């Protein structure tokens, strides 16, 4: 008795341990979602699955039970009354298993479609073929098709159950009789028609009906057809395929009646005829469609397909939100004068002379401070700095987890990044280096931007956990040879209670979490620290932009992300990159210190986000609740902009005939590799190759020109604004035919503006401009000399900006010594307008040489506290002292003497501050 009780207790304990191990992931998810404030989002899925599972299980169980009940007489006849009761138990158990598995599979795969179906929001647009609202295709049709597939699967399961029962019981009965030498029952005399003829007749009829209905549903998929010259249903789809589908559906209905009657009457010929008729129709459809397409449509394709091409143009433009682009004609002239530049000097003052690649390389050499920091990316933003609207590069300084070798350093000691580097986009120092306004550790801030808490616990680095508030403290930042520590005082993370220590030891499969003496009950474990994975964990149904960016807000750092709603179910819209409808409907803000995540709805007209609002109550906030200063940092997402640019290469036209003849197809402008040293390393002008020809020969050197964030002013506008620009060429040619700009400041956010250029003229595109640079004898000679001396020549971004009715071209050249710790420095500026092109040391000299324009002296006198586009404007003695300190700091950095480096940098900061106040 005691042994029995002991065994029961041991088994119970073992079961509890197993359940605990299995449920660790669920328990942690519940705690984490509660911490971030979205526990209701986590349970939305679970509750939906549970709500669906119960009725679906009942449906499955009842259908199978009723079906088995109809077979009871046949089963009793096959096994006898004695064994029938025991067989019933197996049937009940089998029904339970099948129903649980079927309901579970259906609920876990269809819960989302059902929620979309029940919370559908109309688009207010209908497709041109069936006159159905777009919401039918996006929210409803996928569920209906899935349910029909499930119903067909259930019919097939019932047929399989019938066959398995018939074979299993009949075969078992035959073996049993032979083994015991009892009278042998010849199972062949009890055929399957007698066993389940009526049941199979019903199933076959229902299956035929379902197949017929599925063909009616299949008709709706024709709006995604790729058969014709445009995406969506074409002439053949509408006039041939759709009719065939209807005929097949009618044939299936007739067949269901024929099959039912024929099975009962044991007449197989009608069954064969009906099934053969359907098969012939199914086979005949593509044959007739191909014949029609080749011999009817092809000879008259333009006339027959014209309305369907129009449908595709309209749908694609609406779906990608490019149907309301403001298009302006522009015929660029070459008459930029000094007067015109003076009228547009705000454009000149904001010309982008820094490029992300060289700048990030410089940051990594000078601003990492220690090897356990890293800069993952440099983003472009704008701030009001000391009263002036200024575009800047911003790069957060995060912890480099790969530099950590021990568990304690990786998870307890080095827990957060510190501060950021910020420099002006439109200026460099006299050495061609970034003009910093925020730098170093602790942060040296020469702006009026308030940054009190520069710590980064959540960022773009890896997603591994850290444990804060430990006994040893966390490394904060270095000061010479000493290390300052910090104890986390934020709200992020889960408390390390004894229960949680056990839980996370199991979850992370690391006993150190349980055994470490540094971890106390006040310690917190911070999970999902990668901001992209963090927001994906909360809202996986959104698509996120690949480039989050950091913003200084209210004395701390926050991340801003663009999130998209998308689908591939928009009728007649041609898919690009897996979607054929997309909206940037959500802005996500993640606190870099606490990890708080807020989702703000920015497009209230998007039906998909309105559907999500109904499904996930409490997840999204209205835009009115976002702090106003954060709205000033909205960026038009580059991923979306480039996707729209790709779509516009084909769908910038409204005329279906132009799309059909492909007479006006575009390409996004090409750029070449920005490293020019390889091309010119021989230092021989005679051996230099045209970049255009070289790009044609080596496709690896070509790449689509990325959209650039620029601070500029559009023609007819009064103020400069940050914009995203992209350039287009005529397909197969390199002459530029259009410029696309996305506006993002204030009420203009989201507006797209396109300037079209006359196609009969040669307007220099980025690659043609780069080719001109290489072909100019003065420029190529200077570049060849640098390359011949062993320096690496790096080309910056090509900038093309409109100035009233003209185009100004800008390219910068960086030099980088061929040594391990060398840094790229901007050494030359190339400016061009029309056929004129010059290369000079800075913007001022280039403007003076090209246009005889010199207004920077006035700017220098009136803005002594600021750095000009390329030079520090202070007395020579101060500049010399600053240069000497900077060079000494760099030398100390190269030698790994970080204490000395810090001293020189601090002294340099004092000198610069003194210069700025003189």
Swiss-Prot record:
GO terms for cellular component: extracellular region; plasma membrane. The keyword Membrane applies. Belongs to the UPF0182 family. It is a multi-pass membrane protein. It is found in: Cell membrane. InterPro entries: UPF0182 (IPR005372). This is UPF0182 protein CPR_0011. It comes from the Bacteria. Keywords: Cell membrane, Membrane, Transmembrane, Transmembrane helix. The lineage of its organism: Bacteria, Bacillati, Bacillota, Clostridia, Eubacteriales. Its main location: membrane. The chain crosses the membrane at residues 8-28, 46-66, 91-111, 151-171, 200-220, 243-263, 271-291. The keyword Transmembrane helix applies.
């Amino acid at each position: 008795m005691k042994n029995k009780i002991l065994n029961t207790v041991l088994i119970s304990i073992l079961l509890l341990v197993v359940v605990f191990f299995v449920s660790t992931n669920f328990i942690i998810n519940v705690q984490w979602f509660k911490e971030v404030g979205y526990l209701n989002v986590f349970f939305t899925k679970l509750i939906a699955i549970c709500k669906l599972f119960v009725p679906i299980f009942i449906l499955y169980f009842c259908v199978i039970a009723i079906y088995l009940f109809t077979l009871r007489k046949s089963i009793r006849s096959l096994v006898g009354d004695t064994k029938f009761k025991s067989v019933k138990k197996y049937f009940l158990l089998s029904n339970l298993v099948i129903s649980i598995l079927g309901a579970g599979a259906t609920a876990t795969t269809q819960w989302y479609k059902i929620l979309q179906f029940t919370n559908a929001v109309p688009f207010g647009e209908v497709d041109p073929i069936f006159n159905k609202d777009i919401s039918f295709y996006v929210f409803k049709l996928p569920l209906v098709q899935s349910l029909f597939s499930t119903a067909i699967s259930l019919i097939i399961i019932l047929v399989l159950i019938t066959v398995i029962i018939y074979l299993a019981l009949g075969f078992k009965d035959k073996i049993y009789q032979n083994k015991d030498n009892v009278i042998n029952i010849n199972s062949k005399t009890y055929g399957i028609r007698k066993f389940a003829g009526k049941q199979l007749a019903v199933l076959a009829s229902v299956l035929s009906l379902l197949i017929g209905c599925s063909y009616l549903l299949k008709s709706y998929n024709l709006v995604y057809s790729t058969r014709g010259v445009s995406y969506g249903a074409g002439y053949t789809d509408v006039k041939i395929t759709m009719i065939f589908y209807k005929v097949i559906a009618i044939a299936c209905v007739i067949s269901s009646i024929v099959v039912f009657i024929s099975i009962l009457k044991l007449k197989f010929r009608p069954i064969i005829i009906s099934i053969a008729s359907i098969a012939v129709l199914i086979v005949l459809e593509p044959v007739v469609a191909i014949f029609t397409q080749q011999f009817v449509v092809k000879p008259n394709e333009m006339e027959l397909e014209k309305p369907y091409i129009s449908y595709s143009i309209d749908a694609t433009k609406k779906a990608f939100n490019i149907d309301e682009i403001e298009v302006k004609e522009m015929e660029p002239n070459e008459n930029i004068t000094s007067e015109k530049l003076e009228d547009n000097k705000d454009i000149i003052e904001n010309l982008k002379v820094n490029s992300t690649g060289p700048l990030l390389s410089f940051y990594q050499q000078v601003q990492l401070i220690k090897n356990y920091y890293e800069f993952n990316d440099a983003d472009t933003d704008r701030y009001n700095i000391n009263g002036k609207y200024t575009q800047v590069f911003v790069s957060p300084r995060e912890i480099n987890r790969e530099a950590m070798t021990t568990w304690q350093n990786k998870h307890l000691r080095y827990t957060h990044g510190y501060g950021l580097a910020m420099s002006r986009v439109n200026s460099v120092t006299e050495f061609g280096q970034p003009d910093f306004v925020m730098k170093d550790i602790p942060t040296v801030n020469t702006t009026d931007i308030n940054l009190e808490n520069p710590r980064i616990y959540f960022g773009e680095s890896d997603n591994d956990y850290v444990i804060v508030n430990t006994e040893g403290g966390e490394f904060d930042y270095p000061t010479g040879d000493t290390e300052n520590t910090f104890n986390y005082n934020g709200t992020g993370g889960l408390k390390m209670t004894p229960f949680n220590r056990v839980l996370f030891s199991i979850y992370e499969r690391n006993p150190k979490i349980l055994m470490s003496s540094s971890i106390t009950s006040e310690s917190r474990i911070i999970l999902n620290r990668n901001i992209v994975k963090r927001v994906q964990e909360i809202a996986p149904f959104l698509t996120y932009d690949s480039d989050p960016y950091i913003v200084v807000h209210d004395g701390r750092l926050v991340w801003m992300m663009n999130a998209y709603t998308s689908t591939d179910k928009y009728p007649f819209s041609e898919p690009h990159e897996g979607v054929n409808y997309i909206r940037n409907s959500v802005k996500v803000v993640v606190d870099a210190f606490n990890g708080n995540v807020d989702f703000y709805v920015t497009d209230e007209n998007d039906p998909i986000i309105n559907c999500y609002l109904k499904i996930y109550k409490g997840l999204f906030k209205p835009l009115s609740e976002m702090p106003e200063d954060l709205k000033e940092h909205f960026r038009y997402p580059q991923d979306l902009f480039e996707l729209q640019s790709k779509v516009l290469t084909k769908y910038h036209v409204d005329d279906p005939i132009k799309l059909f003849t492909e007479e006006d197809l575009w390409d996004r402008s090409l750029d070449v590799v920005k490293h020019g040293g390889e091309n010119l390393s021989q230092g021989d002008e005679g051996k230099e190759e045209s970049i255009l020809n070289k790009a044609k020969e080596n496709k690896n050197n070509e790449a689509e020109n990325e959209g650039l964030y620029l601070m500029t002013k559009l023609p007819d506008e009064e103020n400069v604004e940050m914009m995203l620009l992209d350039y287009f060429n005529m397909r197969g040619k390199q002459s530029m035919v259009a410029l696309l700009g996305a506006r993002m400041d204030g009420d203009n956010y989201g507006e797209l503006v396109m300037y079209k250029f006359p196609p009969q003229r040669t307007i220099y595109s980025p690659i043609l401009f780069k080719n001109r640079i290489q072909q100019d004898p003065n420029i190529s000679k200077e570049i060849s000399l640098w390359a011949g001396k062993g320096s690496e020549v790096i080309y910056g971004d090509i900038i093309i900006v409109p100035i009233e009715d003209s185009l100004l071209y800008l390219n910068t050249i960086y030099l980088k010594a061929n040594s391990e710790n060398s840094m790229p420095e901007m050494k030359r500026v190339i400016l061009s307008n029309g056929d004129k092109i010059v290369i000079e040391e800075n913007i001022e000299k280039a403007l003076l040489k090209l246009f005889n324009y010199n207004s920077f002296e006035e700017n220098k006198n009136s803005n002594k506290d600021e750095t000009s586009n390329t030079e520090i404007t202070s007395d020579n003695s101060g500049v010399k002292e600053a240069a000497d300190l900077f060079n000494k700091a760099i030398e100390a950095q190269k030698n790994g003497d970080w204490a000395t480096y810090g001293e020189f940098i601090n002294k340099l900061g004092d000198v610069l501050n003194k210069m700025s106040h003189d």
